[in-house]
Design a protein with these regions (language model features):
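A short beta-strand-loop-beta hairpin characteristic of the jelly-roll/cupin
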Residues: 49, 58-85
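Residue-level recognition of conserved beta-strand positions in structured domain cores
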Residues: 41, 54, 73-75, 101, ...
């Protein structure tokens, strides 16, 4: 029988942070023995941002849970898109990007990937 894993909010796993962005995993290889998926909540404080980065081994899907900001992308981060609660973002493997919090409260993002362990460059 396949085992279902429920991760409680006080059991989340802090991951590698990217600049001011903090990620807490709820579904991961360590927590759930996941083999093809990963899910976390990422938070960015007011007037802060993540580092510029890309993922070499996975696609990402992001849902803006609360707050607002800019999502920079493109070869030189030349594309600026406003993001806010309810927006979805698809990030292909290898796509350079950087979320920035421009709002007056914490920017909260739900992040899902198609691999349990990401490689960030």
């Amino acid at each position: 029988m396949k085992k279902i894993i429920v991760t409680k909010k006080n059991e989340l796993e802090e991951e590698i942070n990217s600049g001011a962005m903090i990620r807490l995993a709820g579904v991961s290889k360590n927590l759930s023995n996941a083999t093809n998926i990963h899910m976390a909540i990422a938070t960015i404080p007011k007037d802060r941002c993540s580092t510029t980065h890309f993922h070499t081994n996975c696609e990402s899907a992001i849902y803006v849970l609360s707050g607002k900001g800019l999502f920079l992308h493109g070869n030189n981060l030349e594309i600026e898109e406003e993001i806010s609660q309810g927006d979805f973002i698809f990030v292909p493997e290898g796509a350079l990007h950087q979320p920035i919090n421009t709002g007056d409260k914490v920017l909260e993002l739900i992040v899902a990937r198609n691999t349990p362990i990401e490689i960030v460059e």
